[in-house]
């Protein structure tokens, strides 16, 4: 176990470069204010240093709202003040540091407005029913109700989010006017789409669907239940919001 000072006080911290990436990125990004105590709690439980992008996000931000809030990247926020939970809150970290605790199926590091989930694989993804290699990012796709390997680590994923390639990634999941709808959400809300994103109707004409803001926990819960009913298997832990 490494103590908190060893995790925080490092040479070549990632935050200056990450801050520059955010400023120079081709998509709009809002950096939410951090809670210093919550950020340090995240670092201690994850045992990552401030040299990593994951550590920098936890220590220096309350999360990122990418592309007008379409993607929420979790950091070390206070939760109640911003509506965006911290990494500790969304992953149900123990209240006190527990060296034996690890996320059961991977670390949830982001959500998107329609219930997509970004998670970082743990040491044995296959045992958790997840694709990809250990330490690789995965995505729970709300239009297929399945996990997909992204072939990126966490730092590569953050760079990818800021690179302007989201339009291609979300082809078929965005409709005319999506940006205004995402920007109008409270940080604890997602967009409920009906007919559901995984339905033939939505695949055929997404623009014709009806949409409304609802608590994100409802968006995730409906998708998880639909995956079970469709025989796609247990989606697993999608985050506590």
Language-model regions: role of each:
Residues 11, 66, 97, 143, ...:
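Acidic, low-complexity intrinsically disordered regions
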Residues 157-195:
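Short aromatic loop motif centered on NTY/YTY
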């Amino acid at each position: 176990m490494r103590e908190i000072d060893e995790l925080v006080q490092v040479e070549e911290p990632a935050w200056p470069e990450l801050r520059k990436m955010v400023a120079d990125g081709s998509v709009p990004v809002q950096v939410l204010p951090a809670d210093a105590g919550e950020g340090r709690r995240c670092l201690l439980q994850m045992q990552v240093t401030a040299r990593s992008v994951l550590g920098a996000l936890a220590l220096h931000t309350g999360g990122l709202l990418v592309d007008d809030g379409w993607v929420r990247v979790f950091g070390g926020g206070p939760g109640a003040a911003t509506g965006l939970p911290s990494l500790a809150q969304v992953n149900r970290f123990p209240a006190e540091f527990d060296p034996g605790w690890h996320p059961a199926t991977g670390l949830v590091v982001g959500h998107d407005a329609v219930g997509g989930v970004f998670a970082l694989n743990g040491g044995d993804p296959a045992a958790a029913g997840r694709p990809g290699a250990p330490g690789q990012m995965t995505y729970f796709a709300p239009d297929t109700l399945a996990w997909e390997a992204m072939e990126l680590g966490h730092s590569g994923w953050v760079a990818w989010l800021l690179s302007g390639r989201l339009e291609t990634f979300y082809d078929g999941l965005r409709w005319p006017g999506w940006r205004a709808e995402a920007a109008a959400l409270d940080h604890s809300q997602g967009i409920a789409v009906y007919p559901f994103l995984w339905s033939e109707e939505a695949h055929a004409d997404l623009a014709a669907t009806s949409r409304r803001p609802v608590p994100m926990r409802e968006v995730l819960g409906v998708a998880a239940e639909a995956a079970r009913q469709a025989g796609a298997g247990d989606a697993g832990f999608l985050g506590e919001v």
